[in-house]
């Protein structure tokens, strides 16, 4: 009597582990992953190249589903450390939905430093895209608080009726209840010798810092407050900011900790709160590393009761000047 045997178990385990680790590594390093179809096709080929039993087929199907779920969320990959990323539908809504005054937190952010005059900034995420000019507003009401929201960006300029790409990469927005800041993680820039060609060049800079400014004249008259939040830079969102303000003395000081590079874990030297040209309360001071001055920092105070601070620091390191985004409440 002939017995029809079930197909034996193929060694699919390593494929499952490989595919899962690929998505996990992608999330850890915050890289966008646009080629998940390659893994899905590989899995389909595995099922066609040899017979598989029901258990194997179920496992491979589950792996494919996990890859699609994890990798399709790559546009808002984890901030790798302290700062989670916004991977919800809010990314697309920020580009397409009208302002809704029912949204929580800061509802809009005017783009001034992120895109200069005569330039265009194209943002895209989750199949949606929108082009902004200098002075246009980004709908931040749809973004999650205390998270880095990540968009793809292309910055362009029009010359003789032709749009020329200046740089491209990842556009980041960190939003709090009363303030927000933007950062640009550039991956490619225009070739200095060929305007129609792009070359790889990674650089990180802070764009706009804005929100509901605290008026210098309406600061608390006394007491002190300690703000705790995040410090993030290029490929490093795990930093912590601690900043204390003595309102009676109109003075503040703080520190940045837990960034990967020791040179970036610096003291924010004591500095006085001063009014800017619009009477907004701001603080500017020196950055210290091992008691040596290594740059500067600037913070704005935000909220009707000075609930938040947001700003940036520039730190001189062996690899040049590094920019750090700062936000705390």
Segments and roles (model prediction):
Residues 2-16, 25, 41, 45:
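N-terminal amphipathic/hydrophobic targeting modules at extreme N-termini
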Residues 15, 29, 33-36:
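Low-complexity, intrinsically disordered or signal/transmembrane-proximal segments
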Residues 48-59:
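Bacterial N-terminal signal peptides that target proteins for export
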Residues 68-70:
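C-terminal motif of bacterial Sec signal peptides marking the signal peptidase cleavage site
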Residues 72-329:
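Mature soluble binding/inhibitory domains
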């Amino acid at each position: 009597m002939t017995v029809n045997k079930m197909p034996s178990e193929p060694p699919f385990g390593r494929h499952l582990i490989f595919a899962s680790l690929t998505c996990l590594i992608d999330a850890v390093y915050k890289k966008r992953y646009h080629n998940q179809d390659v893994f899905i096709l590989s899995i389909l080929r595995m099922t066609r190249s040899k017979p598989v039993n029901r258990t194997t087929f179920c496992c491979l199907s589950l792996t494919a589903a996990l890859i699609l779920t994890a990798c399709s969320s790559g546009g808002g990959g984890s901030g790798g450390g302290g700062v989670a990323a916004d991977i919800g539908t809010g990314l697309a809504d920020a580009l397409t939905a009208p302002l809704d005054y029912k949204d929580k937190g800061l509802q809009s952010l005017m783009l001034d430093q992120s895109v200069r005059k005569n330039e265009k900034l194209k943002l895209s995420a989750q199949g949606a895209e929108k082009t902004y000019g200098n002075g246009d507003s980004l709908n931040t009401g749809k973004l999650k608080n205390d998270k880095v929201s990540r968009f793809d960006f292309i910055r362009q300029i029009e010359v003789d009726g032709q749009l020329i790409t200046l740089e491209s990469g990842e556009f980041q927005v960190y939003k709090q209840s009363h303030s927000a800041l933007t950062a640009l993680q550039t991956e490619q820039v225009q070739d200095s010798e060929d305007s129609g060609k792009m070359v790889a060049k990674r650089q990180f800079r802070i764009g706009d810092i804005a929100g509901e400014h605290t008026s210098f004249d309406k600061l608390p008259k006394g007491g002190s407050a300690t703000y705790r939040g995040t410090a993030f830079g290029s490929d490093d969102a795990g930093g912590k900011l601690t900043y204390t303000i003595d309102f009676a003395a109109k003075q503040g000081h703080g520190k940045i900790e837990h960034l990967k590079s020791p040179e970036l874990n610096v003291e924010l030297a004591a500095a006085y709160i001063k009014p800017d040209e619009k009477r907004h309360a701001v603080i500017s001071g020196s950055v210290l590393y091992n008691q040596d001055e290594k740059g500067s920092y600037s913070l704005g105070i935000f909220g009707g009761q000075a609930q938040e601070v947001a700003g940036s620091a520039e730190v001189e390191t062996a690899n040049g000047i590094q920019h750090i985004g700062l936000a705390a409440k």
